[in-house]
């Protein structure tokens, strides 16, 4: 009798353990406070893509294998569809940008470029709040600087890369180590010189989405006509500052891109911290849903705090990005969805290629059983991929669609991407 009792207890323990694994950490279940309603016909912004920066001069170039990991969209690949590169002030260094850019283009990604400094002969120092070594573009060199940017566009084209866009200046309002621009100086360049650039023009790339830099462009018809993409960074920007009513009012026909960030920190070897890495997917969610951004671009692609670690493997932060980048492809459109159906649950939805893609983040310590309802649309089947403390983009079982809705379990401290085939 004793061995049989032990065997029964062991079987029960195994069953309980398996149930705990399926339900996630803590194995506590809650029913979501409300359904997630996905309105397939309520279209928001067109998505250009997700990606990151390659900066050979500062961080070394990506290797051939790392380029595949970054821009390929197979297993153990990030599926990035945007590459940002550096416009070196010295044209003798431009060749360093070519190989990774060509690889990105080969995979269907778009490439854009940002300058930190004009050529040294175009720059002068000035007294900025007591800093006599501050740099700015000489006022009589604006046309020459526009030609410098054009020369980079031409160089890349001659080397097999048609730049999608080029920026006027990286972080002109945080330029302690590069070139400062005042709002008035950027406005002048956008009005008088940006129209001569032979690529889409990005401006003003504020470090913190400070609107005093971009408001003058939006309020000036000529400057606005010469701007194709309003680009910004989100360092320290509160979510309450993500919406931009003036852009909504004046920016018809213009794109809105988030062109650089790392989040939530740049601590050494922080890329695999869990559940901290979930902050990345939540930040992307907020950029898409609260900010209506069309692109989300990380800082260095390969870094100890980035989407790819120095050994070339994808980090937990990278897998959080991949929940968007691998599935929400260029040209997809964000659609309306219940963004916060339960405490610490965040949902966004997109459509394209006859699919609906839903990204659901559960930052709580309990699993959530969530009902998803498709409005103005139907579904034939639902696939899903899950990243948690113990899994990385792990495929889950396909889900049953009943009418126009399906139930799904969102494990504690996890992110799940659902692909709904229509």
Swiss-Prot record:
Family affiliation: Belongs to the glycosyl hydrolase 30 family.
Signal peptide start-end: 1-32
InterPro entries per the UniProt record, alphabetical: Glyco_hydro_30 (IPR001139), Glyco_hydro_b (IPR013780), Glycoside_hydrolase_SF (IPR017853)
One biological process term in Gene Ontology: sphingolipid metabolic process
Entry protein name: Glucuronoxylanase XynC
Induction text: Constitutively expressed.
Active site: residue positions: 171 (proton donor), 260 (nucleophile)
Native species: Bacillus subtilis (strain 168)
